[in-house]
Amino acid sequence: MTQLKNPVLMATIGAAQGLRGEVRVKSFTDDPTALGDYGNLHSEDGRVFEVLEIREAKNVVVVRFRGVNDRTAAEALNGLELFIERDNLPDDDLDEDEFFYADLEGMEAVDRTGKSYGSVTGVFDFGAGDLLELKGPGLRPVLIPFTEWSVLEIDLEAGKLVIDPTAAGLVDDEKSGPGKPFPTKRK
């Protein structure tokens, strides 16, 4: 199999489930049970996985893939990431202001003056809302909230996000002056 040109991470395989080759899968799709609707899934090493059965379980889905017929084969897949080609995502179903998180990666984050704050290297959800990871040349990665206050505009065609650096926590409010560290306790 050839490598995917524009891979999108769809799921990560977890532990084996039962004896018939089923695995627990963390799906990154809006509807976890729709994982098989995007066509065959691919691993980074070139293997192809076809979803035969899928059902919901606690916080994951349980999946049976073609050719994975016993627990030993299922256990060998633990930790494997599964991808599809970006072109397999259904753009026709999106509203004008909707997009896929995969489309944000690589976009440059700029403020209204055009100053760059780096490029989006990841989109994360740790439970309290989505975060964008930004990384600029020679800079440490930073996380900013993916909210309408922090991200003012998304221009997919230009490959840019317009952000409010103050709302994103990248700079202090100009009125308050330079940031001060937390006071230390006196003994």
From Swiss-Prot:
Main location: cytoplasm
InterPro entries: PRC-brl_dom, PRC_barrel-like_sf, RimM, RimM_N, RimM_N_sf, Transl_B-barrel_sf
GO CC, any one term: cytoplasm
GO terms, biological process: ribosomal small subunit biogenesis; rRNA processing
Keywords attached to this entry: Chaperone, Cytoplasm, Ribosome biogenesis, rRNA processing
SUPFAM superfamilies: PRC-barrel domain, Translation proteins
MF annotations from Gene Ontology: ribosome binding
Residues covered by the PRC barrel domain: 96-169
Function description: An accessory protein needed during the final step in the assembly of 30S ribosomal subunit, possibly for assembly of the head region. Essential for efficient processing of 16S rRNA. May be needed both before and after RbfA during the maturation of 16S rRNA. It has affinity for free ribosomal 30S subunits but not for 70S ribosomes.
Free-text domain note: The PRC barrel domain binds ribosomal protein uS19.
Family, per entry: Belongs to the RimM family.
Name of this protein: Ribosome maturation factor RimM
Organism from which the protein derives: Sinorhizobium medicae (strain WSM419)
Lineage: Bacteria, Pseudomonadati, Pseudomonadota, Alphaproteobacteria, Hyphomicrobiales
